[in-house]
Amino acid sequence: MALQRRFFQFVIITLLIPSFILGYTSAVHEDPPHDYHLEEYGYDFKAYPSYITTIGDNDFGSSMSHENGIFGLRKVDYGMDRVLDASKTVNVDDFGAKGDGRDDTKAFEKAWKAACSSTSSAVLLVPKKNYLVRPISFSGPCKSGLTMQIYGTIEASDDRSDYRKDGRHWLVFDSVQNLRVEGGGTINGNGKIWWQNSCKTNKALPCKDAPTALTFYKSKHVIVKNLKIENAQQIHVSFDNCVNVQASNLMVTAPENSPNTDGIHVTGTQNIHISSCVIGTGDDCISIVNGSRKVRVNDITCGPGHGISIGSLGYGNSEAHVSDVVVNGAKLCGTTNGVRIKTWQGGSGSASNIKFQNVEMHNVENPIIIDQNYCDQDKPCQEQSSAVQVKNVVYQNIKGTCASNVAITFDCSKRFPCQGIVLEDVDLEIEGGAAAKALCNNVELSETGVVSPHCQEEGGEEEEEAS
């Protein structure tokens, strides 16, 4: 009987173990990807029903409601983490790269071709050495997901003649899907030679384009994280016509006087989340321009630089649109601007449905600014009748100090005044504790909570606080 009992126990265990394993495996693989939660942004889309009115054909509250279309961003790895351990590894050294300061461009081209043509996911490995690389395009589409693991330093050539074929780009990822670029290494644009030859540094020189250090163009499902990008020739990182992007844990640095060295530039891109980045450059820490929507920015440290900017928009009488932007959680120190919207006269289109919240300013020259008369040229810009419409912009929980006596500037168009602008719990003062001013022209404004300074028409009295 004892033997028979043991036999039955063995049969039961044998039957149960596969079922448990199958059930566990199913549970692991069938868990849906985790959505970004509303609480993560602190963005209550129903918070302003009483004083944001219907503008045009759309209501601001409904246009910013919690929908799959708005919050299409997901905390997913696009399947890359699950297969990373089993990926094919392609080492640039195996293709002739030396990492000794001599030109390794050809080796990088060959290694990329091998990784991109792999039918299984691949890891392109850049070891901990210093690799000199001339302008290069990492072009797709690739046959499978790909990770570029950068442990070392990729350094740009400082010979400007190397950029004759394409003077606007250095490293380009073109038309790649399911891409990760990470590893803790450094991308060094070696930009000093370009800054010295900029018309902004020496006005006697002609104005010419300089390369963007790292460009992602027409790419989808992109993760860029854990990298240092420094001393770009011009813009450091550009996401151009991309969809579904996560950029996180990036350190972006260049000298304060380096011209046009924007940190992260977003153009024509949808569904992008920029988080946990430290940026200090000679231009905008983050710039968001035409064609961008569903942009989420949080946990940013900015300075030196020109702040976090939407625009410029409408240059050369062009049409431009930016919408659905949330900046939640930023610290700006010693920057020329804090949170800024800038548009040229003569343009058309709109910058709409935008929220800046939980922003801390320290000695910032222009903490809050909307400038519909932006003019970045030596000659005065001609006054024009058309403008990019700025509407439905919320500033919530903005606190700190300014380096000038004006903390808030709304310089809006006479013909296309700013509409649906909201200040809620804004407290800004001059460094040292003195009261600051707010100058406001042609703006439809509401205030709620404690707001200081109050808005006033330039040369006029303070507006009454909204009930």
UniProtKB/Swiss-Prot annotation:
The compartments listed are: Secreted; Secreted, Cell wall
According to its UniProt record, which protein family does this protein belong to?
Belongs to the glycosyl hydrolase 28 family.
Positions of the catalytic residues: D283 (proton donor), H306
Any GO BP annotation: fruit ripening
> May I have one GO cellular component term?
extracellular region
Tell me where on the tree of life, at the top rank, the source sits. Eukaryota
Glycan-linked positions = N290
Signal peptide residue numbers:
1-27
Output the SUPFAM superfamilies linked to this UniProt entry: Pectin lyase-like
**GO MF term list:** polygalacturonase activity
Q: Which UniProt keywords apply?
A: Cell wall, Cell wall biogenesis/degradation, Fruit ripening, Glycoprotein, Glycosidase, Hydrolase, Secreted, Signal
Question: So what does this thing catalyse?
Answer: (1,4-alpha-D-galacturonosyl)n+m + H2O = (1,4-alpha-D-galacturonosyl)n + (1,4-alpha-D-galacturonosyl)m
Annotated organism of origin: Actinidia deliciosa (Kiwi)
Fetch the PANTHER family from UniProt.
Answer: PTHR31375
The task this protein performs is described as: Acts in concert with the pectinesterase, in the ripening process. Is involved in cell wall metabolism, specifically in polyuronide degradation.
State the protein's name.
Polygalacturonase
Show the PROSITE patterns listed in the entry.
POLYGALACTURONASE
